[in-house]
Amino acid sequence: MSRHSQDERLGLPQPPALLPLLLLLLAVAVPLSQAGVYYATAYWMPTEKTIQVKNVLDRKGDAYGFYNNSVKTTGWGILEIKAGYGSQSLSNEIIMFAAGFLEGYLTAPHMDDHFTNLYPQLIKKRSMLNKVQDFLTKQDQWTRENIKYYKSDPFWRHADYVMAQMDGLFAGATKRAVLEGKKPMTLFQIQFLNAIGDLLDLIPSLSPTKNSSLKFFKRWDMGHCSALIKVLPGFENIFFAHSSWYTYAAMLRIYKHWDFNIVDKDTSSSRLSFSSYPGFLESLDDFYLLSSGLVLLQTTNSVYNKTLLQHVVPQSLLAWQRVRVASMMANNGKQWAEVFSKYNSGTYNNQYMVLDLKKVNLNHSLDEGTLYIVEQIPTYVEYSEQTAVLRRGYWPSYNIPFHEKVYNWSGYPILVKKLGLDYSYDLASRAKIFRRDQGKVTDMESMKYIMRYNNYKQDPYSKGDPCNTVCCREDLNSHSPSPGGCYDTKVADIYLASKYKAYAISGPTVQGGLPVFHWSRFNKTLHEGMPEAYNFDFITMKPIL
């Protein structure tokens, strides 16, 4: 780090002066009393090959942005970063490093909280920690070796951008911790956070059990979610939304807007807005609005055929890395699927919905290529063009594989035989609820409503179970309540997406008079940095820099 005058020495990020603060608050619609907006600019020092940070918003800097720490008042932090638009010309790798550095610097305290909260949810034994650490170390090494070896390959070049961003994230978080006299996070902890989704399959693959009971698994513990794409009858508009399900320990949230000036003939998207978490260089949910005109949604498919998990090896790219590379490179759904399919790790096995808004002609047609469905299991990725289904009105997604081969190989037919039709694609409770209620979606408010829907006491399809519905509340389970379920919803349409805008709400649903979730009922579950109660409204997410 180069030495500068006393005035320029790196301090902690400070709240901004009142005028820019007011401008920010006007743009993000947060009352002044709730403000905790911090901004900073990162400068690449080419001689020293380091980053210097100043607590100013300088458009000539190599990366600049702000973090609105409004988690306690809206349920969301908001991060916006622009990189590569400064006065000096930088390589794409340095731009990505600077962007990662600034994010780490601005959000390090919440990154630390998020790791604290999630670690005990995933790691129950020290022996498992060692196995996970060993796997992630080997996987990281394999990835970096390939990046070096295949320098001229566009795929690996983009993998390099993602890894440079992660290296920056680590360096920036370290800088902030040192300044505050705190113990910095390790690189493994950063890798662990980014691989949370992958760990949901990696951990079972590292600890094969002889007879895992099918009856007592929780619906939310594998990161299950609900998603819906809805087209109005005359193609007047297209809505899309996602509600995340996982442990409530993951409810420390950041909505992110990134705009990176990456100059590469093989890059289709370097600007994106997405729902995320502290320290994550991916959405995890997934809910992405990309500058290529693609929208990406995802729900998780459990793999009940445990023999498939034997094929998980570190010589592969994790799902979060492949999602980032595919989302940067692809200009359409088919390309996205092709890129994503490479070096499949068989971890975080999901259904991805890739919606191409460039193919949507409102009031006229949904052209071929509007919707691609991509599904992954270990050793296999299947994708298909499914616009014909969407033309009939909607595409629902609810944690059961669509493609027959993926469904069969994952072990669902056996599950249906043992546990009934709730695990079939056509007759799962959410399949029935979406089929019944999607026709009521006519505008943004009704789309929000269906995605927060939980009427488990009266709805015959829920059978009295607070998780047999669109927005699960396992904490309301009368037999064995636990702090998990559906804890957010993000909604947008074609008009909002063109401006990188969306509406987002954080916390378990209270629709129809359901009780507000309070952490006091589940104090043994770590929830550092979170509000005690979750009773927030939808807020508008939009970039303002």
UniProtKB/Swiss-Prot annotation:
User: Which residues are modified by glycosylation?
Assistant: 68, 305, 363, 408, 523
Q: Can you supply one Gene Ontology CC term for this chain's record?
A: extracellular region
Please name every pair of cysteines joined by a disulfide bond in this record: 467-472, 471-486
Propeptide at which positions? 206-224
Q: What is its main location?
A: other
Q: Which GO terms describe its molecular function?
A: phospholipase activity
EC main class here is: hydrolase
> What role does it play?
Exhibits a weak phospholipase activity, acting on various phospholipids, including phosphatidylcholine, phosphatidylinositol, phosphatidylethanolamine and lysophospholipids. However, in view of the small size of the putative binding pocket, it has been proposed that it may act rather as an amidase or a peptidase.
**Family per record:** Belongs to the phospholipase B-like family.
Name of protein: Phospholipase B-like 1
- What is the source species? Bos taurus (Bovine)
